[in-house]
A protein has these predicted regions:
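Transmembrane alpha-helix interface/packing and boundary motifs in multi-pass membrane proteins
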Residues: 37-46, 122-132, 168-179, 262-268, ...
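Membrane-embedded alpha-helical segments and adjacent helix-loop junctions characteristic
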Residues: 18, 35, 48-49, 53-154, ...
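Hydrophobic alpha-helical transmembrane segments in multi-pass integral membrane proteins
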Residues: 183, 259-263, 311-330, 433-444
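Juxtamembrane and boundary regions of transmembrane helices in multi-pass small-molecule transporters
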Residues: 1-16, 21, 133-136, 154-161, ...
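Lipid-exposed faces of alpha-helical membrane segments in multi-pass integral membrane proteins
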Residues: 4, 8, 31-38, 53, ...
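Structural signature of hydrophobic alpha-helical transmembrane segments
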Residues: 17-31, 74-86, 135-137, 212-217, ...
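Alpha-helical transmembrane segments of multi-pass membrane proteins
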Residues: 113-127, 153-174, 200-208, 342-355, ...
Length: 451
């Protein structure tokens, strides 16, 4: 039903007479963008399949030149996604992540509150070493469920919901403060590079976003879990004994540590995070050095690669077709942004970008809004980078689970009811917006983000 409505809306836009201020080419571009973003939003097809349809329709009907449609493939950010997918597969195959999870969780199974803290911290740590959000969800949720069972929490119990939701909320929301950790971050970085030739460096992004949207939000998730899903642990299993690390685990640890060091120091050596990730991914499958066979490479899930490429292509199409300029004028008039009123501008743009995620999904939000960043910067008087970074503040907040595809994957994996998830998601979003936006503004003011 919803998919049919989206398709009908797109067809109507494609064939109706141009509205005031629009050309026939702009109407066709708008129709394709509505189709693509709409199908992502309603989940009509797997995200990567919708992305491939975007490429196909754009080229068959000559909606835009190939260098616009496939612009995402020129971005180092897209290759960060590929490297991250390979590393995620390697982490799973070697058992390294399971080992880390046992080390982090087992000692805390005597206390529910301590176990919640351990789960949140583990999700944050994994965000640094495992770039794919879906991969972290698929890895962490079964381990958290097992840890919950060791602490006496049966499937469907209050403690079970608390632990699994803490893992899912942290995996996505705190991961938005770490550049390679989530798809929206990568789409934003790719859009900044392809649209404005403005690279977002790993360390710089970490400084701007992680202190508040990573660490402080992690603390907020812990408190929300304790409050909305209180429980008491009763250990039912003895402490686990870990075997010695395998040679594959040792080699993979070395690869991940080296990649992390190079990511953090990218401002010094100038090698983009994407090429570091790609090198690390290649190292994982090289003979002797690597930890995966050639055949295992074929089992890497490449869907996210084409999904991100399509989101970057939609962003470039929005800009090159002139739609971004028209949308920017409309948004500026609606929000009534004022030069010099930084706090008001910051709050309005953050709220706008947060709500936009409900209609576009959070991964697609930066693809849709990044082309408007220059307009936001011009009206507010901010540097372009600040306008772009404000988009990340918006997609770091999840109002509804369908905004975040990995969240939906985790809910299905853990068999969580949608309504029960909203019990925590909506209050957490409200508290986060009220408490964290002023704190984020103060932090950005301190580091000179507003010029």
């Amino acid at each position: 039903m919803l998919a049919g409505a989206v398709a009908l809306s797109a067809l109507t836009l494609a064939f109706m007479p141009p509205v005031a201020g629009m050309t026939p080419a702009m109407m066709k571009s708008c129709a394709l963008i509505v189709f693509t973003i709409g199908f992502w939003a309603v989940g009509a097809l797997p995200e990567h399949l919708t992305g491939l349809l975007f490429f196909l329709i754009a080229m068959v009907f000559a909606i835009a030149p190939a260098n616009v449609v496939f612009s995402g493939f020129e971005s180092a950010t897209l290759w960060l996604v590929l490297g991250g997918l390979i590393m995620a597969e390697a982490v799973n195959r070697t058992g390294l992540a399971q080992r880390l999870a046992v080390l982090m969780f087992d000692r805390y199974c005597d206390s529910y509150r301590h176990l919640v803290v351990a789960v949140v911290m583990a999700a944050i740590v994994l965000s640094f070493v495992m770039p794919a959000t879906v991969g972290r969800v698929l890895l962490l949720v079964p381990i958290v469920i097992a840890a919950g069972e060791r602490a006496g929490f049966a499937v469907g119990s209050r403690g079970y919901y608390g632990l699994t939701l803490a893992a899912l909320m942290t995996t996505y929301q705190c991961g938005t403060g770490i550049l390679p950790a989530n798809a929206p971050n990568l789409v934003l970085a790719g859009a900044a590079e392809t649209l404005y030739r403005l690279p977002l460096h790993y360390a710089e992004y970490l400084l701007w976003q992680f202190p508040v949207m990573g660490l402080v939000k992690g603390g907020l998730i812990i408190l929300a879990t304790w409050w909305f899903f209180p429980a008491t642990a009763s250990r039912v299993a003895a402490h686990a004994e870990l075997p010695a690390m395998t040679s594959e685990q040792k080699r993979l640890t070395a690869i991940l540590v080296l990649a992390l060091v190079l990511w953090i120091t990218d401002f010094a050596h100038g090698v983009k995070a994407g090429w570091v990730a790609l090198a690390a991914g290649i190292a994982c499958v090289l003979p002797r050095i690597g930890v995966m066979s050639y055949a295992a490479f074929n089992e890497v899930r490449f869907g996210a690669f084409f999904y991100v490429a399509a989101t970057l292509g939609t962003g470039m199409l929005t800009q090159q077709s002139g739609l971004s300029a028209a949308l920017g004028r409309g948004v500026d008039a609606t929000l009534a942004l004022q030069p010099g009123d930084d706090f008001r501008n910051f709050v309005l743009l953050s709220l706008f970008t947060t709500v936009a995620g409900v209609f576009t999904t959070n991964p697609a939000q930066p693809a849709v809004l990044a082309p408007l960043a220059q307009s936001f910067a011009d009206v507010t008087g901010w540097p372009l980078k600040t306008a772009l970074m404000t988009l990340a503040v918006g997609f770091s907040t999840m109002l509804l689970p369908h905004q975040v595809p990995p969240m939906m994957v985790g809910m299905q994996l853990a068999k969580l009811r949608y309504g029960a998830v909203l019990v925590m998601a909506l209050p957490l979003a409200a508290i986060g917006l009220v408490a964290l936006l002023p704190l984020q503004y103060a932090w950005w003011r301190l580091i000179g983000a507003f010029g």
